[in-house]
Amino acid sequence: MPLTEHLRELRYRLIISIIAFLIGSGIAFYFAKYVFEILKEPILKSYPEVELITLSPTEPLFILIKISLAVGFIIASPVILYQFWRFIEPALYSHEKRAFIPLLLGSILLFMLGALFAYFIVLPLALKFLLGLGFTQLLATPYLSVDMYISFVLKLVVAFGIAFEMPIVLYVLQKAGVITPEQLASFRKYFIVIAFVIGAIIAPDVSTQVLMAIPLLLLYEISIFLGKLATRKKKEIQKA
């Protein structure tokens, strides 16, 4: 296919994806206030006395728009992923097509697991520690900006969703021969430190560090295991 045809196809797929995103965001706007109530739950459970306040007349509108865009992207993600698949499908071999779908579904599942883990486990613990530090140690008045709180929640949820993609990324890199399971195994001791540092950045108390580091370490071990399976299968095919 000529380059102009590729660019035309890419443009078409991007337009469809953008339209799906805009439609999804428009639909999500009607449910944004309900999503906001869900996002408020962790802080209300951690510190019921906290009052969420707005700092400008336009802040409530921008908060609803921010939530709508985030939820709209989730709603549109099946369409966006399908357009991505249709764009790259002609360039893939049959065995690559068979491998791509499980990887795609696996990445979606892992992202959702990471987001749910952040919302139900990490967020309440982080809020309890961070707000406790401010309200009890510094004797600060328990008021929080709604916009800053929602931004914090969305960033944390997305960050853990992306972090949970680690097995997929490392599996692909190992399958492509960029890195080996042996290299990952030798890097394990450094990754343990990295996992606990990440936990310390979010909430420096020991129990929260451990709770956040354990899933990352498990995902790392799963990545090594999947890489060993991939390289073993590749060697068997080469021998045959």
UniProtKB/Swiss-Prot annotation:
GO biological process, alphabetically ordered: intracellular protein transmembrane transport; protein transport by the Tat complex
Entry-linked InterPro entries: Sec-indep_translocase_CS (IPR019820), TatC (IPR002033)
TM stretches of this protein: 15-35, 61-81, 103-123, 152-172, 191-211, 212-232
UniProt keywords, alphabetically: Cell inner membrane, Cell membrane, Membrane, Protein transport, Translocation, Transmembrane, Transmembrane helix, Transport
GO cellular component: TAT protein transport complex
Localisation per UniProt entry: Cell inner membrane
Domain of life of the native organism: Bacteria
Predominant place of localization: membrane
UniProt topology in membrane: Multi-pass membrane protein
Molecular function GO labels: proton motive force dependent protein transmembrane transporter activity
Keyword Cytoplasm annotated: no
Assembly mode: Forms a complex with TatA.
Protein family (similarity comment): Belongs to the TatC family.
Function (record text): Part of the twin-arginine translocation (Tat) system that transports large folded proteins containing a characteristic twin-arginine motif in their signal peptide across membranes.
Record NCBIfam families: tatC
Protein's recorded name: Sec-independent protein translocase protein TatC
Lineage of the species this protein comes from: Bacteria, Pseudomonadati, Aquificota, Aquificia, Aquificales
